[in-house]
Amino acid sequence: MAYFPVNINIENKKCFVIGGGTVAKRKANMLLDFGADVTVVAEELKQDFEGCKVLKKPFEYDDIKSAFFVVASTDNKKLNSEIAQYCRENNIYVNSVTNADDCTFTLSSYIRQGDVVISVNTSGKSPALSKYLREYIEKIIPSNLSELLDNINGIRQNIYEKYGGNARHIFRKLIDYGFKNQGKLPVG
């Protein structure tokens, strides 16, 4: 089943990562990149979880009662499935790194330049393909999308007021120009 692509604001939301290894670290960093309040629960930490709250202890369901969402990223597939089942039963969004069928959401591979976020998702079927596509896209897009977005946003209201129904065509021309000119827009 394909997952519906949606972008949500997770700034200051309580997000829990269960597990202390490399995959847990990568997932925690993704969440931190978007301002989440990340708590890592693990009996053993194999990584440094800078920026996260850390509960160095065995996982208990009480740990995640206040969670907006949970990432089950232990090296124990059975435990990840049990965590996912608990989350589903308690209406907590959950991602399991060991079984896509346990997930109520997936974490996309993404490119971020300021407020420009481009994500690639394979509905949990092939994270390797998602990564490959992300790396491919990174090679073909300009490195100044954030600047272009800021410039477009700065004139957006004026364009709508001046051009009304033709604004979409004007934006297309401005974006084409910005792609060719390092994010800069024509003056005037």
Which residues are covered by each model-predicted region?
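An accessory alpha-helical subdomain
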Residues: G124-G188
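Residue-level detector of alpha-helix initiation sites
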Residues: G21-V23, K78, G124
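Hydrophobic beta-strand scaffold residues
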Residues: V38, V54, Y93-V94
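Glycine-rich, highly charged phosphate/nucleotide-binding loops
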Residues: F49-K65
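Short loop/edge segments at beta-strand edges and connector loops
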Residues: A42, L55-P58, T98
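Hydrophobic, well-ordered beta-alpha structural blocks that scaffold small-molecule cofactor pockets
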Residues: M1-F49
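ADP-ribose/adenylate-binding Rossmann-like module
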Residues: F69-S73, N80-T106
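Short basic, glycine-rich beta-strand/loop surfaces that mediate nucleic-acid
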Residues: F68-T74, F105-G124
